[in-house]
Amino acid sequence: NIVNLMAAATLAYAVGMQPEKIWHALAKCHSTWGRNQFIKTKNQVDILFDGYNANPDSMNALIKNVSTLEVQGRKVAVIGQMREMGSKAQELHEELGLLVGSQKFDQVFFIGENFKDFEAGLKKAHYQNYLVDTDLTPSMKEVFLNYVKPQDFVFIKGSRGIKTERFVDLCEPLNWNSKY
């Protein structure tokens, strides 16, 4: 459970453990594919991947927890659409954009059919460092690859059908099986 891991990491930090030691200890924890996986990459980017499922509650909890992390580099959020939201999809994605835009992410990427609703929320939060589209387009891939640098922390969350794991694959993961 990511909330328990975050609580343990916070407690470790509060009692004086160095952030790098905490991160390395968390990296040794293993979970089910797509559920709060800590992934190391060839280019020294740290990734938290949660691409198995997404709903408003899980997005809210994880985004708020990740936003409190102290990292060496920049914090990058990759958000995939929450699927199966029915008639509330527009409203929920706008609220999600507002939440993400109010956190301290250096850059945000969003993919999914509700990208305009998500963008409306980002704009309400007066957030400007983002790229949104219906899918991982060649231009988004290029921007992402040129943006992410060693020591950056990339947080990836979305519904399974959006295939957000493609962003993980772009970073040349070391301890990863992209096959679901």
Enumerate the language-model features and the residues they cover.
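ATP-dependent carboxylate-amine ligase
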Residues: 7-180
